[in-house]
Amino acid sequence: MSTATQSKVVGYLPQDRPPVGKMLLLGFQHVITMFPATVLCALLMHFNVSTVLFVTGLGTIVALLGAKWSMGNYIPLYYGSSFSYIAAVTMVINQLEPGLAFGQPASAATISVVQTGFIATGVINIIVGLIIRLTGGKAGVDKVLPPIITGSVAIVIGIGLGFAALGMASGTCCVPADAYTPQVSLTWWAVSTLTLVITILLSVYLQGKGFIGMLPILLGAVAGFLIAIPFGLVQPSFPSALITPPTFTFPDFTNPLTLSVMISVGIMAIATIPESTAHLYQISLYVDHLAEEQGREKLGLSKFIGLNLMLDGLDDLVNGLFGSTAGTNYGENNSLMVITRNYSGVVLITAGAIAMILGFLGPLRDAVNVVPTAVWGGLAIYLYGVIGMQGIALMIAEKVDLYDPGKLAIGACILIIGIGGTIGYPNGLPIPLLTGVFPFGWPPIATAALFGILMNLIFLAFKPPVVRGTDVLE
């Protein structure tokens, strides 16, 4: 097995195996990096934190081994919970089990129905990956899912969750109306706002500061927890047993809502496909740069776009089979690898194993549950906003022409249908069609995405006239 000790340049390529001690420490760093977002995502979607930690670790290992089996090397990516599915999942859970408090896990029966949506997501990713592998590129997929659609859907996902974030930050989501006094309101706002501001400052001023720069969300949550103590928002809890097995659930394809869930949740894959592709390009660039510095052969991981999406789908199948949230490869773990120059696949497998072990620790779950909702609300304002801004960043990076009336129309309709529907019709748009499939109403984000895809296909089939610049005036 080749190791980085063969070169004077420090760093580990995907095929390298560090010594055991370093391997454990580097793996634990990955777990700490993915922990805040993965846990928060589980709490927001009413999934069991311990189960999500265990299964995301398992999914990461399965994806890494799948790459090793398929191409003879690892694609160094860590899979955690995806925020792109929060709106679609919470809509389904609110239909099946309304009134759940923040962080309260849904029943096994409810989670089993949601899991079918993650199975659908996995299948979609695998199909798209196969198409790319067979056609030799992603140009065909970009025609059906251009950046104006994927970027607009990302904006909808983030901004559409704004109302929920403000409810958590203010306490209106959780405090009974008769107990919601001005003093209570001020207390919640104080804790959530201070948490938000501290987290933003940490994100801005710790960037580029090494490993600690990867932990602004975790540090912000700790700071918010400490702030909440004198405000009386921290409620003590009795510790669980040291070893508490995760609660595994399995997909329920017999529920009458299964088809509706598979459509409304599964289509969210269109938001994660461009994200995953961008992460692969990023990590491929840095891996090849390190290989060049070490005088070793470049791996060219960027040419495995199709395989990477198939592995994403494989990870989602694992999540959907055992009761975790839908996954995505984490940009924060990519950044950690760039900073530490450690791209070892074995280290990532070690990280997955550590996450699986943490899933059995009862006190860890207790520590997460004792953090006040106001603290999570402050973090949610920031994180949800970032999701929306990433959609804008995607369109800027892809140079989307918003002076093109077709693209402008697609983006405009996706935003209004998606955001307006998510906030105004949280249980679904009141469209009296296909009521057997969508008994509570059409899922807003899925409806917005499908409308955008349909309009784009019309424009592809019937090319509109190209009018630019002064031609408009003439």
Question: Could you tell me what each predicted segment is?
Answer:
Residues 1-77, 84-108:
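N-terminal signal-anchor module of multipass membrane proteins
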Residues 47-53, 71-85, 142-149, 213-218, ...:
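Short, non-helical or kinked segments that cap or interrupt transmembrane helices
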Residues 21-37, 184-199, 215-216, 229-233, ...:
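Hydrophobic, membrane-embedded alpha-helices of multi-pass small-molecule transporters
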Residues 2-13, 17, 201-202, 216-267, ...:
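Hydrophobic transmembrane alpha-helices of multi-pass solute/ion transporters
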Residues 1-25, 175, 179, 238-249, ...:
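Intrinsically disordered, low-complexity non-transmembrane regions of multi-pass membrane transporters
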Residues 13-14, 20, 43-72, 267-345:
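Membrane-embedded helical hairpins/re-entrant loop segments and their flanking transmembrane helices
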Residues 109-236, 350-469:
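Membrane-embedded alpha-helical modules
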Residues 92-94, 333-348, 354-358:
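Interfacial segments of multi-pass membrane proteins
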